């Protein structure tokens, strides 16, 4: 069977569904529809479009283009917050609290034309807290819980939303964190409650639907096949430049490359570095790249007695050939980095100090002996080609180096959703995963990677990587809080620098590299709009 025929066959049911909706998607011709952006992307990790539950960057990218937020990062400056659902806001604060009052713009409507107001948004925000799923942590870390949510979120009228915080949290941090969060989506309460099952407030419905105010609506989602977004006819803002966004699930980079070369798609999202270099040198394909605030991590489960030992965790860092990886596998993919704060964020250690480790097998052996494992041990590494395509070859490199000091790693491969399930259930020894900073402020990394509000298994704090790894250090918790409330910018930056130096020696992770976000596209894409968050603005993309 030739490749084209295979591609068409594998996506036939999704294509049929798209055709049934009246959309013409060319699978084998040289042009995609002028009003449609067609992307190829590995969508293995997406399991829901519920703002209360979604916890993967792929689904999040789609959701923030379907559901508007109160505020959003500017297209040309990720650190600048600009109005969205809110046309303006006021901040009042003292030594005890912070209050932010948002004034909603006129003309907000759901996709079917019904008006949306502040009470709908308050319900949506409370829903996140009450469902106690992954993104509840976004509110919890600012002191908003099920016990005080009615007082914290209020709507004095249809156009006003008031958020009250019981500590003097920096308003700029809250705004930048919430700007990239899914938690401030204005949901369609009427639709969701019609589809409520056993008190889930529409959670199961949102596994395959959207119901919110935004420029696009989710027309179709077929796991393993693709996503179709259609522009909303009742959107309050400027109409999207393109009427439809079709995201095809294409797992293999080689297949994505073939589709892109033939112009059967407009954009490829998962190409390998060698493919990108070759395409740039030999074709008309354009490549866009930005260093993103995202890190790839090798995590250690501290509930496992072996990895509860700090010296074992430190020994693992000396098994990583940072220099070799940087020159080969990670070239044009990312920057080797052992710090939890990405380059570009406040207080981030520079490139040299942020990566002090090197491959040192004698040092690793010494630490293992001091930890009580002179003959090594057996453990597993969980990794997957999706959504981290370089995790498997890095894991294999680690496996080879570990053998030389007596550590016997078994590599187990999983697809994205399985990998996240293992992470959330703490059912792993070591695991590869990624973490993206939700703002330009380092607290949003420290608050999830270091801080742990409750390490009990029954707490199910799956929004915290620290909890997923069973890591709780009360001293480090306090240092995270102290840095958060430090008002002097220079002192605050120094506190984060010190926190990085300490955490890279004792934390439950070995940070591997900070990633580049790289996208390849045909010349048909005339305007690609994103910032360094990176936030991609589907509605502003032009062909």
In which residue ranges do the predicted regions lie?
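Gly/Pro-rich hinge or "lid" segments in bacterial periplasmic/extracellular proteins
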Residues: 74-76, 179-240, 244, 362, ...
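N-terminal lobe/hinge region of extracytoplasmic solute-binding protein
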Residues: 40-93, 126, 209-215
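Surface-exposed binding/hinge segments that line
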Residues: 103, 140-194
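Structural transition elements
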Residues: 335-370, 387-393
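Ligand/substrate-recognition segments at binding pockets and active sites
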Residues: 39, 222-225, 369-439, 489, ...
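Long beta-strand-rich cores associated with HINT superfamily self-processing modules
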Residues: 458, 519-543
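Ligand-site clamp/hinge motif
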Residues: 204-207, 232-278, 408-410
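Extracytoplasmic/peripheral linker and loop segments enriched in polar/acidic and small residues
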Residues: 357, 405-419, 424, 447-522
């Amino acid at each position: 069977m030739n490749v084209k025929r295979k591609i068409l066959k594998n996506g036939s049911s999704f294509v049929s569904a798209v055709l049934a909706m009246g959309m013409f998607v060319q699978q084998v011709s040289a042009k995609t529809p002028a009003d449609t952006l067609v992307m190829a992307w590995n969508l293995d990790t997406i399991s829901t479009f519920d703002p209360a539950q979604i916890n993967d960057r792929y689904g999040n990218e789609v959701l923030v283009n379907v559901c508007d937020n109160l505020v959003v990062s500017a297209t040309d400056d990720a650190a600048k917050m600009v109005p969205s659902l809110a046309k303006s806001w006021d901040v009042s604060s003292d030594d005890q609290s912070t209050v932010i009052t948002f004034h909603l713009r006129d003309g907000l409507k759901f996709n079917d034309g019904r008006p949306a107001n502040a009470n709908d948004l308050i319900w949506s925000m409370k829903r996140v807290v009450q469902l106690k799923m992954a993104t509840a942590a976004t509110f919890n870390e600012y002191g908003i819980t099920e016990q005080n949510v009615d007082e914290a979120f209020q709507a004095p009228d249809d156009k006003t939303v008031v958020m009250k915080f019981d500590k003097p949290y920096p308003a700029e941090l809250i705004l930048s964190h919430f700007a990239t969060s899914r938690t401030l989506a204005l949901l369609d309460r009427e639709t969701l409650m019609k589809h409520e099952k056993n008190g889930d407030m529409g959670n199961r419905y949102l596994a395959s639907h959207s119901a919110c105010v935004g420029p696009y609506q989710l027309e179709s989602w077929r796991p393993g096949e693709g996503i179709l977004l259609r522009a909303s006819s009742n959107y309050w803002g400027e109409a999207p430049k393109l009427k439809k966004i079709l995201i095809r699930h294409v797992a293999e980079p080689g297949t994505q490359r073939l589709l892109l070369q033939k112009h059967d798609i407009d954009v490829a999202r998962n190409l390998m570095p060698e493919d990108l270099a070759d395409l740039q040198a030999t074709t008309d394909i354009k490549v866009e790249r930005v260093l993103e605030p995202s890190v790839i991590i090798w995590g250690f489960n501290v509930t496992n007695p072996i990895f509860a030992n700090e010296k074992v965790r430190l020994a693992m860092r000396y098994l990583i050939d940072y220099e070799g990886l940087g020159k080969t596998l990670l070239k044009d993919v990312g920057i080797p980095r052992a710090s939890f704060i990405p380059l570009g964020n406040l207080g981030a250690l520079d490139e040299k100090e942020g990566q002090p480790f090197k491959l040192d097998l004698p040092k690793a052996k010494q630490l293992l002996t001091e930890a009580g494992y002179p003959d090594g041990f057996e453990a597993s590494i969980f990794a997957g080609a999706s959504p981290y395509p370089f995790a498997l070859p890095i894991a294999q490199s680690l496996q080879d180096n570990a053998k030389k000091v007596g550590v016997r790693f078994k590599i187990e491969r999983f697809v994205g959703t399985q990998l996240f399930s293992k992470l959330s259930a703490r059912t792993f020894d070591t695991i590869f995963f990624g973490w993206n900073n939700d703002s330009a402020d380092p607290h949003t990394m420290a608050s999830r990677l270091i801080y742990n509000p409750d390490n009990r298994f029954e707490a199910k704090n799956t929004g915290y990587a620290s909890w997923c790894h069973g890591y709780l250090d009360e001293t480090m918790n306090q240092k995270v809080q102290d840095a958060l409330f430090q008002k002097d910018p220079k002192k605050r930056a120094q506190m984060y620098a010190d926190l990085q130096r300490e955490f890279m020696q004792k934390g439950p992770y070995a940070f591997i590299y900070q990633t580049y976000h790289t996208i390849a596209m045909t010349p048909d894409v005339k305007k690609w709009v994103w910032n360094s968050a990176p936030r991609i603005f589907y509605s502003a993309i032009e062909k």
